[in-house]
Amino acid sequence: MVERKRWSENFSEWFNEVIEEAGILDKRYPVKGMNVWLPYGLKIMKNIEKFIHEEMERTGHQEVLFPALIPETEFKKEAEHIAGFEGEVFWITHAGHEPLDVKLILRPTSETAMYSMFALWIRSHADLPFKVYQIVNVYRYETKHTRPLIRVREISRFFEAHTAHADFEDAERQIKEDLEIFDNLMKRLAIAYIISKRPEWDKFPGAFYSLGAEVVMPDGRTLQIGTMHNYKQNFAKAYNILYEKEDGTHDYVHQTTFGMSERLLAAVIAIHGDDRGMVLPPTIAPIQVVIVPIPKKEKQEIVYEYAREIEEELRTAGIRVHLDMREKRPGWKFYDWELKGVPVRIEVGPRDVENSTVVLARRDKLEKITIKREELVDKVRELFDDIMKYLYERANEWLNSHIKRVETLEEAKKAFEDRRGIVEIPWCGEESCGLKMEEELDAKMLGIPYPEEKAKAPEGSRCPVCGRDAKFIARFARTY
């Protein structure tokens, strides 16, 4: 039976233990907020990134790789951007014993690194749209409590796509494409999420507007796992990114960005997990099927040979399979692979050899079935599909059960006491009322539902702060 008591009631402790015991990260590196990726965790993350690369290829983005150091002179060109990031920057002031003439920063994000180069590369309307991406390390001096994968000082798997366009309409088309890319990725991770348009006071520094994607974690807090920003011409004017139009005149490009990070893995671990550990979607599991032989001494070699044949059959079928031949008791192995979230476990003993059968155990539901050996490959693939469907349905049910619509601040406070996740409240649209609600609720405004046609407040609803007619539904949450 699947239990999720500790997973939800003591999530922070559960998460830290799983990260460590399942071999995702080692947190003991002697710089706070910087962690060491272990082989198993890195394999999962690279499997996620494989889908990102595929989507980038499909949509015509080209991969680039920029230096990690940015001169202070470039960083300071966009005033609003600096104001938003200056307090989080790691500065390099010396080279050896010599002070630098121009200080350098470790990139917190790459706008200020990339856009001076964009100004050299983009010349004509024929160069547009211009679409590049990279997956790199970025550095932010987080002053809040750091958490592995969630809030770190070195984001080591930071994906950022940067685009330039001839006009605002084409930039808007790019945002729609980013949302489609993100949705395709979430389907492969079986993750349910919401998209919100950030309030003016919480948009990305230098952006015209920002969108954020959130999931609800087991403790009811939300985690931002993706962002899309339309910069309009704000950065283009600061970095002089001009192009020649078809009529011979010049104009500044319109720009967008799209970002994700290892928080994607944090969401997978958190949302699909249970009290026994991780539950990995088959799409990203480094090992999709683990085979655990259960031999008796007198029939040990026969069982091992049968297990090897099964391993070879699955590998030939393109399934990521591992045969566990460690000298440990089967029960110990079951515990270990359940902790690591391997989607399907195969158990084979002497009786299976005699009857030409195989026992399949599902990690998601902790259920077992016995099948005929000749059904193996088809049945495993069928199980993968069923696991993906079940994980998504469970994640979607979790998300929807943790969004509550209320009318008053008192109802909102009660919802947060009950760890409801996301609370939706009518809002007049005034910043002062939004900030007052944040203060009263001790929560952050995520923004309004996106697309904006979903954000309109019901007829007759009132802003609970000023009492005026509400224009929007605003989402609030306690966040990571």
From Swiss-Prot:
Keyword tags: Aminoacyl-tRNA synthetase, ATP-binding, Cytoplasm, Ligase, Nucleotide-binding, Protein biosynthesis
Catalytic reaction list: tRNA(Pro) + L-proline + ATP = L-prolyl-tRNA(Pro) + AMP + diphosphate
Main subcellular location of this protein, as a coarse class: cytoplasm
CDD domains: ProRS_anticodon_zinc, ProRS_core_arch_euk
Any single Pfam family the record assigns to this protein: ProRS-C_1
Domain comment quoted from the record: Consists of three domains: the N-terminal catalytic domain, the anticodon-binding domain and the C-terminal extension.
Record family assignment: Belongs to the class-II aminoacyl-tRNA synthetase family. ProS type 3 subfamily.
Protein name: Proline--tRNA ligase
Protein's organism: Pyrococcus abyssi (strain GE5 / Orsay)
